[in-house]
């Protein structure tokens, strides 16, 4: 076998007949497969042992030679070589065809490669190949043109006139002769001359032909090899025949297809030997051609060949295509051994880095390890004995298992794996039962819940894999979300509620105002029931020993609550005492107003002080998230994970103690709800009257009514939230962020509001009842539309979002951080992203974690805040914005000069770790996952504003697809192609509006539809590429008008707009990586003296290389314009044919690659996965794998101290 790791590249080409014969181990002459009585392969048949090797290891067919000692012998009786049966997976055979046959890929593909080369139409080719017409190969004295088609009758006429003086042939033979006569160099010269003079369609055709001729010339493929004289037969184990229980046989479809070819070929040979009449031979040749077509690509031409039950047979091409094809089923997605799956249950007592494995599963997964250990400890005598002990589950097995799994991490995965946090490593602990136990905090990353979800377990076997799992994938390491750098392990549900309840304060709590010496006293008093969790008390500040308290403060009493004292025990000591949920308190110090000077208290002591003070808000989910982020910023990952565990335990403990329940009585209907409804009802009546009088249109009436009822709902919601008791359980759940929100509550206690019809249009009749009061039949019926649409949408959305992620990953999979600094001289100018007055993404968020491209000085003090190529930390970012600076140049993936992938400086901080990104990080895949994963949270719907035509704005997922596929958007905006002033806006014919822009040299007028809103005024100056009407810009057009940089920024802004409006935060750099991949090609306009072809798409780097070469030799350079490709198109245009073929349109990609003789340098991840190499990212990168080991005494201890996760 070939060693995969010695591969450097992979090349594909056409096979010459000699090459096919050299692969073959013998010719298959008979269509037989196996003998029905002996079940042995037939000699010279499709499974022949003489050709393909023995079916049993080290045993010839007749049984004369058995055992390994005869290795390499060829049996003199049956001619079978004694060797391993595995060779039946690699040895090929062949069929010598009695007549040449065309290869359907090259004749039928679009464009037809054969047609372009011969300059014949695909129709003409088809007529010749399938024996409907003759083609003139050598005209002789007839005056016919070469390649002319002749019908049967015309051929006879000419034949009678010029017997034996000219040559015209039918079938693939004629085409083969023509292909053999082609002189590629001559053809190339002619085509290059034609390029100079041709225009329009002729030019396009010439360019296409030139491309094919160049391909053949450069690749060393001969055109005649597109016609087959010899047909290869793939090894038999790849098209197996297996016996089923009933004694019947199941066989691969390929065997049927091969059988048809062999039968027809043998019949043709016989007919030729007998000298049969031409028409019979012709018919047989045509049938042979069709049989070979069906074998290569069944169904490409005509009706597909069907098997039993009218099912089309799967040909060689189908074996590669689609989700079930060789690429996606076996090469990119393999099933793995040492894996198990089971239902998950919550494991509240686990540490952050642990998971619970069911005993039986663990035993099965770690079987070989346990067996080895049993034998080593001499508990079992040999491996066989150890195996039986394990199968009987003897008692001594369990102790060994405990030992074996200690410090051996396992990987847990939940499908669908939408981002890299869908697979994490844990240290297993054995649990009873058959459910996998999962730590409650990692559920958010997996998007898992415990209603019956299942998860898969995988065991990393090698030492390297274990080390990677422990160092990089341990759940305690994955605290930040790669998409925005925020903690992903925030507490949820019970944990939030428990911590919220713990930090709540109540006015009526027992013994308010009591003063204690230290925290221990407080806890004792709480345990004895003297104070309640919600009691506000005073404690001597000095007893906290908090480093952030000033001397002054230490002399005073800290006013806080019992619960907050308990909560602060889980926070690291160097933090300020957290007494209120504000950033100030969290990042800097406890506000001074909570320190009370005991001498200033009046008669009533602290109690009186508290009675005049407002209650402090309890800590909700968002604030807990901020605490985690702050701890992460200041401490190591280990400390953070310990703090998280303590927060989780606290939350569970106190949500249990709180005993929060929900009853019908907790839903209090608003008393003056009816009054609000009546007021709005009157407003609706007024609108209806106006409509009846003809003062307003139907659309205006509808929009006004919808607005009135929306306002009514908002008013009820506002008043409801005001009137609620702060200790109402439902309010507590929604306020803490544990479950539900204000809108849910309004539906329960206020009114349900307006509903959407199945069309997406809003029904103007509102549901005025709430669930508490109950809905009328009509109201209930109206509300079912929305519910059903919601479910249908979710199902569609999941599939759409998954497909989007797949396309994104495919286009960006080869973007890896490949160098430290690319040395670019360009940068990206960033500022706030705004839509009108609404802030979409603030400037500070855009610069944090990036490298600066310029020196920034404070505008007042002139002090240097940051120099070029320095990282902008959160502190520096705050300094920059505080100085009043609103825009700056930063390093960006858009302007990175790295040839493959990006460089560290242009990418910036790695959001998953908060450190600078390292060479080898697969940032393309991370970017794709970060954009694709929130896709399921985006809405599907296009907002219908009451059926007003033209103003439907696409939003949510469809809009994201529209942007990344670079499609023409719905509701397209008109942009100006010149800089100037808006001279006039007038009505044109067909109810259109005309906008006239006057520039310095020319005046242009633009037409907009009558319904679109114009957003410029007469006399307003406009820049090139500026929007004149409301809507989305068509990006391809914008690229040619406004240029590359403006287009990149526009696409970035549009993507951010969609996600931010849905409340999803994604870092700019991910979008930048994707957009850069869409703009990495240029289209050649003029070739100059370079070898580039005009009209062809080339990689921007290849273009600059060609021009550099031209400048060196003082030749004319090529000119080109940037092209924006949608992600699907960009994936198919990638340099790597393996990656493109495994994505979509497999046959087209391979046909093209074979003719060009493409080589794949295996730079991306996908290509390497396909051939089974380590991926060239992370630890698989060359620079990390070619490491020299030095043995020293020191590192072992260091490594151990790092891997110990403190309890």
UniProtKB/Swiss-Prot annotation:
Annotated organism of origin: Staphylococcus aureus (strain bovine RF122 / ET3-1)
EC number in record: 2.7.7.6
Domain of life of the source: Bacteria
MF term (GO), any: DNA binding
Residues annotated for Zn(2+) 2 binding in this entry: 822, 896, 903, 906
Protein known as: DNA-directed RNA polymerase subunit beta'
Enzyme class: transferase
Metal-binding is among the record's keywords: yes
SMART domains named among the record's database cross-references: RPOLA_N (SM00663)
Transcription is among the record's keywords: yes
UniProt-annotated binding residues for Zn(2+) 1: 60, 62, 75, 78
Binding site for Mg(2+): 449, 451, 453
A single GO BP: DNA-templated transcription
HAMAP family in alphabetical order: RNApol_bact_RpoC
